[in-house]
Amino acid sequence: MTIRSPEPEVKILVERDPVKTSLEKWAQPGHFSRTLAKGPNTTTWIWNLHADSHDFDSHTNDLEEISRKVFSAHFGQLAIIFVWLSGMYFHGARFSNYEAWLSDPIHIKPSAQVVWPIVGQEILNGDVGGGFQGIQITSGFFQIWRASGITSELQLYCTAIGALIFATLMLFAGWFHYHKAAPKLAWFQDVESMLNHHLAGLLGLGSLAWAGHQVHVSLPINQLLDAGVDPKEIPLPHEFILNRDLLAQLYPSFAKGLIPFFTLNWSEYSDFLTFRGGLNPVTGGLWLTDTVHHHLAIAVLFLVAGHMYRTNWSIGHSIKEILEAHEGPFTGEGHKGIFEILTTSWHAQLALNLAMLGSLTIIVAHHMYSMPPYPYLAIDYGTQLSLFTHHMWIGGFLVVGAAAHAAIFMVRDYDPTTQYNNLLDRVLRHRDAIISHLNWVCIFLGFHSFGLYIHNDTMSALGRPQDMFSDTAIQLQPIFAQWVQNTHASAPGLTAPNAIASTSLTWGGDNLIAVGGKVALLPIPLGTADFLVHHIHAFTIHVTVLILLKGVLFARSSRLIPDKANLGFRFPCDGPGRGGTCQVSAWDHVFLGLFWMYNSISIVIFHFSWKMQSDVWGSINDQGVINHITGGNFAQSSTTINGWLRDFLWAQASQVIQSYGSSLSAYGLLFLGAHFVWAFSLMFLFSGRGYWQELIESIIWAHNKLKVAPAIQPRALSIVQGRAVGVAHYLLGGIATTWAFFLARIIAVG
């Protein structure tokens, strides 16, 4: 008798043709909601249409259907990203001076946009060098193209076309995986398989592919460019890939092929996989051989990580088991029940991912200037400032988004019956202690950090400089930060074996990298002024966290409104007859959190902009004397509020205010226009709904008088809608004002 092993069960993971493709249905506005599909009676309809069109939770309660919509939407998002990237590369190919910049990146500035003369706009086309007239760009694309080994505009064309093809594929995939072969819920909930594929596939193989490209294409091309070879003389990428002898001329270990790899003699490859530290003195960017080594190491780590989770075989980790095993002496049931949250609530997943991605984006902002990854990035001050500012803003928005979705999870997806005495439940039960302590911390930080400035302003005003907190009077040196800097600067070998220099020049030492007479990077001194402003950072960040965390922890209930969960994520007040219960919804906390996020990030980017202009950026003459843009005035001037207003905001706004009649005049107009947008927001934020409803009714009366009354009845925005429009314009106006101020300044002086 033969005993057969049981036949493996084939899991059916997709459903065929679940939703028919119907253009008629899509053409009907509001098709996803019975109420909205009836069409508009009042102007509120258009607002609700925008508010709910992507709120898949409100379309259906079926988790599988919601998951499919989210999955499909992600492909749409990727398509948009590919179209955007294609546009960037197309501008580089069609309208830019990339090839000229590549031949002389020190004297020629990047430009990829030429303004058409219609009513005299050609004034905006400034001279960027090399006889090219255009708008100076600060996105960093030229630098990243050079680092990837792009040597001609034809290559940019090809990449742009490739990106469009990928965009089409993504759109097709989004349609296919919703209408033709939609995954089942079990597929979305198979977290181990998802982890394995994302870690090994996206991060592991993605990094490996990039490392391979860097080794075979970027390194040799950049090596030749650094040596001053004309880009047109450099062999094309496929020649390096197909002809090993070409590479061996630049990196001798290539002649040995894979023998050192299989004989574990890996140090043979140290001519193109290095641990040098510091910056390449020719380009002022990280050594590309270091970044290749980094991507190879990342690839190895993630390829290993992508084999750690248990799927079809009975080996490997199970996320549920890991979570449930985490019980400490003071944590009750630990993480029991958390796995179920993460597999049934997309909002909970999204909240975690946004919090981590937001933090990571802010870390990226700080690394882009301290370890500039691309050639000639460090001496392009406009791009340095733009990249820092951009990544800080994005990080701030993502972190607020994390709180928003955490609160939506609490309101819509949290089931108190399954969460008993685990960590989430315990946090919710002692939320009063958390919030009241955090509130105390905010008050302490606010009074003490701002108090130090007010003390300085008072002493300065009374003519008593010797009684101020500054490097030349009462010193408050950031000794811990200086210790961290010193440790890194004095012992680079602790970071990596045989490292020649520390990870970043900013740590200290006497190293200075200048490219073409401009400072790329040097050790950044920290003093009393930095100590003061860092405590302002601590204050604003803690207040942001207080508002957002209170919104999450009190999203379902509070002493004031015990049944808050029944009112939903956003509601104006707890009904008539309950005064003093307005603006308490989780949505309102996100609304308020956005303002404090804006405060936090503004002070960070102001600090960065002034500090770099004062202590890092500038020119260096043949004698080695550095002339900083603002002459090192940060340490003395920024210790008073008056100094920030006078020597930063006012002094540095002169370029944007005086830009009319020059190629920077667009920034002057933007500065004015964005101030207007910002001021417009106050109209929504400072007035109540009733005021507008009353006004609208008298306007309707006038229309009726003239027999031109509209069929769709006009109504004032709801309270929540008004606040949403207000905060959107506040942020848009504020960010665009800052953008114009920064760029006009840094392009003029940088």
UniProtKB/Swiss-Prot annotation:
UniProt keyword NADP, yes or no: no
Pfam families according to UniProt: PsaA_PsaB
Binding residues annotated for [4Fe-4S] cluster, in chain numbering: C573, C582
E.C. code: 1.97.1.12
Alphabetically ordered keywords of this record: 4Fe-4S, Chlorophyll, Chloroplast, Chromophore, Electron transport, Iron, Iron-sulfur, Magnesium, Membrane, Metal-binding, Oxidoreductase, Photosynthesis, Photosystem I, Plastid, Thylakoid, Transmembrane, Transmembrane helix, Transport
Record-listed phylloquinone binding positions: W692
Binding locations of chlorophyll a: M683, Y691
One GO biological process term: photosynthesis
PROSITE patterns: PHOTOSYSTEM_I_PSAAB
A single MF term (Gene Ontology): magnesium ion binding
Cofactor binding description: P700 is a chlorophyll a/chlorophyll a' dimer, A0 is one or more chlorophyll a, A1 is one or both phylloquinones and FX is a shared 4Fe-4S iron-sulfur center.
Membrane topology value: Multi-pass membrane protein
Alphabetized NCBIfam families for the sequence: psaA
Function: PsaA and PsaB bind P700, the primary electron donor of photosystem I (PSI), as well as the electron acceptors A0, A1 and FX. PSI is a plastocyanin-ferredoxin oxidoreductase, converting photonic excitation into a charge separation, which transfers an electron from the donor P700 chlorophyll pair to the spectroscopically characterized acceptors A0, A1, FX, FA and FB in turn. Oxidized P700 is reduced on the lumenal side of the thylakoid membrane by plastocyanin.
Family: Belongs to the PsaA/PsaB family.
Record-linked PANTHER family: OUTER MEMBRANE PROTEIN, OMPA-RELATED, PHOTOSYSTEM I P700 CHLOROPHYLL A APOPROTEIN A1-RELATED
Name of the protein in its database record: Photosystem I P700 chlorophyll a apoprotein A1
Highest classification ranks of the organism: Eukaryota, Viridiplantae, Streptophyta, Embryophyta, Tracheophyta
